[in-house]
A protein has these predicted regions:
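Conserved C-terminal helix/tail region of periplasmic/extracytoplasmic solute-binding proteins
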Residues: 291-321
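Short beta-strand-to-loop elements that line the ligand-binding cleft
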Residues: 55-63, 80, 152-162
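A structural signal for short loop-to-beta-strand junctions that line the ligand-binding cleft
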Residues: 26-28, 93-101, 126-130, 204-209
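Secondary-structure end/capping motifs
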Residues: 224-301
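Alpha-to-beta junction loops
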Residues: 54, 72-81, 93-96, 125-126, ...
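Pocket-lining segment of extracytoplasmic ligand-binding domains
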Residues: 83-84, 164-256
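Hydrophobic/proline-rich hinge and linker segments of small-molecule sensing/allosteric domains
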Residues: 98-118, 210-221, 225
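Bilobed "Venus flytrap"/periplasmic-binding protein-like clamshell domains
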Residues: 23-47, 107-110, 115, 119-187, ...
C-alpha cells in the first residue's frame, strides 16, 4: 500500500513539474525582408534573453498581405502590421489588437545633386511611391503639401510599385524622387542619396509632435488574454534584444547576414535607422495622437483606408498589465 501511495505521489510530482515547465508556443509570421527577423534572431541567440514561459515558432510569410491572411486564418498568432488595419477589423467585430514595435515609417529621397530641396520643389517632377494610392506615407505627404497650397497628386507624375522596384526607378533615373519605407530609403542614403523629409517630419508638419508607432505586433485580444504572462514576457524580451543589437557590436555582427547586403555603409545606416525607431514612450498622449492621425487619414482616403468608422476603435491598442 505504501509503495502504491509513493508511486502515485511521484507521478503527481512529475506531472506538476512537467506542467510548470511547459512553455507557451508563440507562432509568429515574419517577412524575410523585415527587421523583426533581426530582433527574433538576437532573442533566440542569447540564452539570457530566453524567458522560461514562452518559445517562438517562426513562420516565414511572403509579404504583408500573406501575413494578414495567415493571422486571420489562425495559421499564426502574431504578425507585424499597422493599427489602422487593426481598427478597421475591430469595426467589423474582430478582436485583433496592436502593441507597438517601431516608430519608423518612410522617407522622401532624392539624388544628392537634385534641385529638389522641399516638398514644393516636387511640382512637375516624377515621383516614385512605395505601395499604392492609399499608402499612409503618401496620404500624409499630400496633406502636408496641401498646407503649402500644393495639390501634390495633380502636380507630380506618379509611379507606384513595390519598395525594391521604387529604389531601382531612382537609380535608373526614371523618377526624380521616391517616397519609400525607411529601410529601403536607408539603403539609398547610404549610397549618397539625400533625404528631404521623413515620416516623423511629415507628422510634425501636420501638428503631431508625439512619436506615434507606425507598425506593431498584431494578435487576437482573446488569445493574448489567455496567454498574458507569455506575451508580455515576449514583448519585454524583444525590447531587450533590440537594445542588445543597438549597444553590442558582437550581437549586431551575428544578424548582419539578415540585412541581405555586404555593403558596410548600408549595414551601418540600417542599424542606425533600426535603433532610432525604438518605441521609448507609449502612453495616453501617443494614443491620442494616433486618434488624430486616424481622423486625418479617414478624410484623406475618403474612408477607403480606414473603413466607415468615424474614429479609432476602442481596444485597438493592447495594454501590458
Amino acid at each position: 500500500m505504501k509503495s502504491n501511495v509513493f508511486f502515485i505521489g511521484l507521478c503527481l510530482f512529475a506531472s506538476c513539474n512537467s506542467f510548470a515547465a511547459e512553455k507557451t508556443t508563440i507562432r509568429i509570421g515574419v517577412q524575410a525582408s523585415g527587421t523583426l527577423q533581426w530582433e527574433l534572431s538576437a532573442l533566440q541567440d542569447d540564452p539570457q534573453l530566453k524567458p522560461a514561459d514562452f518559445q517562438l515558432e517562426i513562420q516565414p510569410v511572403a509579404n504583408a498581405e500573406a501575413g494578414k491572411i495567415a493571422l486571420q486564418s489562425g495559421a499564426v498568432d502574431i504578425i507585424v502590421s499597422d493599427w489602422i488595419w487593426v481598427s478597421s477589423l475591430r469595426a467589423t467585430g474582430a478582436d485583433f489588437t496592436f502593441y507597438p514595435y517601431s516608430n519608423n515609417s518612410g522617407s522622401l529621397i532624392v539624388p544628392n545633386n537634385s534641385p529638389i530641396h522641399s516638398i514644393k520643389d516636387l511640382k512637375g517632377k516624377r515621383l516614385g511611391i512605395a505601395g499604392g494610392e492609399l499608402d499612409k506615407n503618401w496620404l500624409l505627404l499630400q496633406a502636408l503639401a496641401q498646407k503649402e497650397q500644393l495639390d501634390l497628386s495633380a502636380s507630380v507624375e506618379k509611379t507606384f510599385g513595390a519598395p525594391p522596384l521604387i529604389n531601382e526607378q531612382i537609380k535608373q533615373n526614371r523618377v526624380d524622387a521616391v517616397l519609400n519605407y525607411w529601410h529601403f530609403a536607408a539603403r539609398l542614403e547610404a549610397q549618397g542619396y539625400r533625404q528631404i523629409i521623413d515620416g516623423r517630419g511629415i507628422l510634425k508638419g501636420l501638428g503631431i509632435a508625439e512619436n506615434v508607432p507606425s507598425i506593431g505586433y498584431v494578435f487576437k485580444q482573446s488569445w493574448a488574454a489567455d496567454h498574458k504572462q507569455a506575451i508580455n514576457s515576449f514583448f519585454k524580451a524583444g525590447k531587450q534584444a533590440r537594445n542588445q543589437l543597438c549597444t553590442s557590436n558582437a550581437a549586431w555582427k551575428k544578424v548582419i547576414p539578415l540585412t541581405q547586403t555586404d555593403d558596410v555603409a548600408i549595414q551601418t545606416k540600417l542599424r542606425q535607422g533600426y535603433c532610432n525607431g525604438g518605441v521609448d514612450q507609449w502612453g495616453e498622449k501617443e494614443q491620442q495622437a494616433a486618434a488624430r492621425i486616424y481622423t486625418m487619414l479617414r478624410t484623406l482616403s475618403n474612408n477607403q483606408l480606414t473603413g466607415k468608422s468615424e474614429s479609432l476603435q476602442p481596444g485597438t491598442f493592447w495594454s501590458i498589465q
